[in-house]
Amino acid sequence: MKDSEKPFLDHLEDLRGVILKCAAAIGAGSILGVMSIGRVMEILRWPLTQAQEGLAQPAPSTLLALQVTDPMTVTLQIGIGAGILLSLPLVLVVLGQYLLPALAVRERGLLLPVFSVGTVLFLGGALFCYFLVLPKALRFFQDFNRWLGLESSWTMTSYTDFALQMLVGFGLSFELPLIMVILARLGILEQKVVSEHRRHAVVALLVLAACVTPTSDPFNLGLMFVPLYALFELGLAGMGWAERHARKQGDSLGRT
């Protein structure tokens, strides 16, 4: 029996199996993340230490735990985040196996490239934030505090929340060109229409940058908006390629 002919309850049973496999993979990755929490915290603190370089009077890079439960909360938060990241390849494979029978032949050929490019873009965005954006953002806040005559002493909860939101936000934002290409490939969105409404797109990108950035200051907003706009232009070029590719496929099918 083909997958499309399965009874509804059988589809629910398959979905239940997919959810259990994904949950097990994330759980195993979370356990590994909790077990290596010391090393993970060192990695997460690296942008903070980089922000201190070159300062005549560097601020203390030690994070504070003001609440009794702060260390446990941060450990679980980082553990789950590490679990999702470590299990992502396996989760994508399981989801792909579940979705594959329901897709047309042409759509099946797009599944692996979309997953691969999406993963690379997310990791690229997170690494861009980690090595370039986070140290500059932290340095900005330290300099601003010093200008106000304040000493920078951050809690581990506030720091990890800020760092993780920035990393995930940049990772998701870097998916923009892929989303634009997919919409063009499916015929939902046209490059010409997007190009004609570029000014509206710029406003939308500013709103997106403001939503993704944990703070509302212009400095961090700019750090998010500039790469977002570059990705938008890249996505616009990708939309043109996708439309040309779709037309070529249509012409070849028409001749046959």
Q: Where does each model-flagged region fall?
A:
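Membrane topogenic/interface segments and analogous intrinsically disordered interaction regions
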Residues: M1-T256
